[in-house]
Swiss-Prot record:
Source species of the chain: Oryctolagus cuniculus (Rabbit)
Phosphoserine: residues bearing it: S295
Keywords: Actin-binding, Cytoplasm, Differentiation, Neurogenesis, Phosphoprotein, Repressor, Stress response, Translation regulation
Region (Disordered): 292-317
Family per record: Belongs to the IMPACT family.
Subunit record text: Interacts with GCN1; prevents the interaction of GCN1 with EIF2AK4/GCN2 and inhibits EIF2AK4/GCN2 kinase activity. Interaction with RPL39; this interaction occurs in a GCN1-independent manner. Associates with ribosomes; this interaction occurs in a GCN1-independent manner. Associates with actin; this interaction occurs in a GCN1-independent manner.
Role noted for this protein: Translational regulator that ensures constant high levels of translation upon a variety of stress conditions, such as amino acid starvation, UV-C irradiation, proteasome inhibitor treatment and glucose deprivation. Plays a role as a negative regulator of the EIF2AK4/GCN2 kinase activity; impairs GCN1-mediated EIF2AK4/GCN2 activation, and hence EIF2AK4/GCN2-mediated eIF-2-alpha phosphorylation and subsequent down-regulation of protein synthesis.
GO biological process, alphabetically ordered: cellular response to amino acid starvation; GCN2-mediated signaling; intracellular signal transduction; negative regulation of transcription by RNA polymerase II; neuron projection extension; positive regulation of neuron differentiation; regulation of cytoplasmic translational initiation in response to stress
Protein name in UniProt: Protein IMPACT
Length: 317
């Protein structure tokens, strides 16, 4: 190892130890070997109104000649607001080249959240819009305890805790799929109204690992007996088109009265189209396991039938 690399490694280790000591449970080690970490930052520890997850990967050249590779995860952070915060972090790096800056970044973000809480209404604490970079906050997957028309549903993203008018449905967790350090895991709950969708999402996001996932893609279908229609919707959570693909799978399998959430923890290697395959496989596996489809064989037949119908339509045009 070069002398410079050894020096950087020592400084990184010292900074990591300091961050863990300062922030305690808020500081999470994602991949110690790859130097990937995340920290959940809020405007107020006891009564958070605004929360953001900062995920960082420390390159070998940091802090000497390169900045940390970072990702800001928050559902409300978009457009100019995201650009302004990114510019602030990059300005801190430029002003402190060669120095350890993670603490400065965290406290800058906290200042922004505090300022935001004083100026605006509370935002969602638990979901986030991200792009395909970096990961979550713990290593182990979640372990579970021992004629039809489509009607677009109202936006059910969690903006406040739902009223306790319904019992929270039971939530099941699927077997994780891991590929090139990315992990995918499905979560499923029976739902019969949008209020239950909100409740399940809120309950899931109470789990630090799930709420810190790079993406939480979901879709649901609720059959309305009186109108003979489906109430359904989906959410990409920053993984473009993933929610629509998941909903399409559920339509093909003709499942009803169910919510499926697929968490993805990105491991630093781009998967390309394979990520959509893993998302749908996770969802399909748990739907089959929980008997929302008749059998794996019938699910495959349904998919094959759908492809044939599409090909037939193409040939007719």
């Amino acid at each position: 190892m070069a002398e410079g690399d050894a020096g950087s490694d020592q400084r990184q280790n010292e900074e990591i130890e300091a961050m863990a000591a300062i922030y305690g449970e808020e500081w999470c080690v994602i991949d110690d070997c790859a130097k990937i970490f995340c920290i959940r930052i809020s405007d107020d520890i006891d009564d958070p109104k605004w929360t953001l997850c900062l995920q960082v990967m420390l390159p070998n050249e940091y802090p000497g000649t390169a900045p940390p590779i970072y990702q800001l995860n928050a559902p409300w952070l978009k457009g100019q607001e995201r650009a302004d915060l990114s510019n602030s972090l990059e300005e801190i790096y430029i002003q402190n080249i060669g120095e350890s800056i993670l603490y400065l970044w965290v406290e800058k973000i906290r200042d922004v959240l505090i300022e935001k809480s004083q100026m605006t209404e509370p935002g969602p604490e638990v979901k986030k819009k991200t792009e395909e970079v970096v990961v979550e906050c713990e290593d182990d997957p979640i372990v579970p305890p021992q004629p039809e028309n489509s009607a677009k549903a109202v936006d059910v993203r969690v903006r406040e805790k739902p009223r306790e008018v319904e019992e929270i449905p039971p939530i099941d967790h699927g077997v994780p799929i891991t590929d090139r350090r990315s992990t995918f895991q499905a979560h499923l709950a029976p739902v019969v109204c949008p209020e239950q969708v909100k409740m399940v999402l809120s309950k899931l996001y109470e789990n630090k690992k799930i709420s810190s996932a790079t993406h939480n893609i979901y879709a649901y279908r609720i059959y309305c007996e009186d109108k003979q229609t489906f109430l359904q919707d989906s959410e990409d959570d920053g993984e473009t088109a993933a929610g629509g693909r998941l909903l399409h799978l559920m339509e093909i399998l003709n499942v009803r009265n169910v919510l499926v959430v697929v968490s993805r923890w990105y491991g630093g290697i781009l998967l390309g189209p394979d990520r959509f395959k893993h998302i749908n496989n996770c969802a399909r596996n748990i739907l089959v396991e929980k008997n929302y489809t008749s059998s794996p064989e019938e699910s495959s037949k349904a998919l094959g039938k759908n492809k044939k119908m599409k090909n037939k339509k193409r040939n007719e045009h």
